[in-house]
Amino acid sequence: MRNIALRIEYDGADFVGSQWQTNGRSVQGVLEAAWQQLTGERRRMTLAGRTDAGVHARGQVANVRTDTRHTISTIVRGLNGILPEDVGVLAAWEAPDDFHARYSAVRREYRYVIDNGRTPSPLLRRHAAYVPRRLDTAAMDAVVRQVIGTHDFAPLSDGPQEGSTVRICYEARCTRTEVWGQPLVLIDIAANAFLRHMVRNLVGTLIQVGEGRIDADRFAAVLAGDDRRARVLAPAHGLYLMAVRYPEDGTGAADEPAAPHGVTETRMQL
């Protein structure tokens, strides 16, 4: 039996989330339906990251065990011919038998996109959170670096957690850019794994720093669990799962070396 890995991107606006659910349309559900139509097999796919309703992905990874004899290129072309317009397979590859999209991952990377223009862009309304007040990105960048390292991120999580709430954050930064003349603020964070709502709570609190509502000390108090009142959950539609990385690839499933059998095109980089 083969173990096929897929690199996927999707617009999360019209999904109830990435994981299969009984109450609505999920990314996993449409992927499994497309797989069955292509191969005739009913298979359960494993996704690397669980994304909430409205959250998007540029580098989600899934794996599926299969008896199909389709080539990798046929799998990519076939799935993309079946999948709806808001989901696409960017690449596929033969994975080792013990590869597991979720448990084999060693690093996940998220990006949060904020529309920081004087008026919100209609083109970004489902793909960036709008904040009208000009954000102090220098202050945000200085403060967000507090999360780098090994910490208990329970104060930034919601709901019950499985196992330890300690995570290793490898990178955190805040930058400013433009798309079509519209000012954007980008918050990038990478860690070995994330808790439920961890990134959105971090970003929502960080926005308050950028607005001048709280200072670095109060941000630190939120991280320590001493000031839950200052914690704010940012909207889902500004969040993107950008990449999932594995020890055997050295570069990550969202990088171009994995793309010979996938889709190659010029894209706007948010």
Curated annotation (Swiss-Prot):
Gene Ontology MF: a single term: RNA binding
Keywords: Isomerase, tRNA processing
GO BP annotations listed: tRNA pseudouridine synthesis
Region (Disordered) residue spans: 251-270
Subunit organization: Homodimer.
List of catalytic residues: D52 (nucleophile)
Enzyme class: isomerase
Gene that encodes the chain: truA
Source organism (scientific name): Roseiflexus sp. (strain RS-1)
This protein's name: tRNA pseudouridine synthase A
Membrane-crossing residue ranges in chain numbering: none
Purpose of the protein: Formation of pseudouridine at positions 38, 39 and 40 in the anticodon stem and loop of transfer RNAs.
Residues annotated as binding substrate: Y110
